[in-house]
Design a protein with these regions (language model features):
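Residues within the helices of the helix-turn-helix
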Residues: 17, 28, 57
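A short, Lys/Arg-rich alpha-helix, primarily the initiator
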Residues: 1-25, 72
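Short juxta-domain linker segments that transition from a proline/glycine-rich
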Residues: 10, 21, 78-105
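Short alpha-helical DNA-recognition segment
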Residues: 25-43
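Short, basic-rich loop-to-helix N-cap that marks the start of a DNA-contacting helix
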Residues: 48-62
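Short C-terminal boundary/hinge segments that cap the last helix of small helical domains
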Residues: 65-83
């Protein structure tokens, strides 16, 4: 299957931050509502942590956006990362082939 590849993979944390801005809610307030440390939430927003099922359920409760949506975003992020990594490997292999072809003149 030939899937269109994004330029970068978008972590669900980006969308959590968008929701915070839209709702004029601080990270501290969201962390308090979720019952998590602010540092945990900050790492989630920065893409250093994955959205798991427990986190997705908390986000669903607070933002009224389905847990399935949050899990889908995480899944898509991971797939995009893997595809981008594979594409990079293919490009490096291709570049190496061209380099060695150029030295065999």
């Amino acid at each position: 299957m030939n899937k269109t590849l994004p330029f970068v993979a978008t972590h669900p944390g980006t969308l959590i931050l968008d929701e915070l801005v839209f709702r004029k809610m601080s990270q501290k307030e969201l962390a308090l509502r979720m019952g998590v440390q602010k540092s945990f939430l900050n790492e989630l927003i920065k893409g250093k942590r994955a959205v798991n099922a427990d986190t997705a359920l908390l986000l669903e409760q607070i933002f009224e956006i389905s847990a399935e949506y949050w899990m889908s975003l995480q899944s898509q992020f991971e797939l995009d990362q893997a595809r981008l990594k594979q594409k990079t490997k293919e490009r490096l292999a291709n570049a190496a082939a061209w380099s060695s072809a150029g030295t065999n003149k």
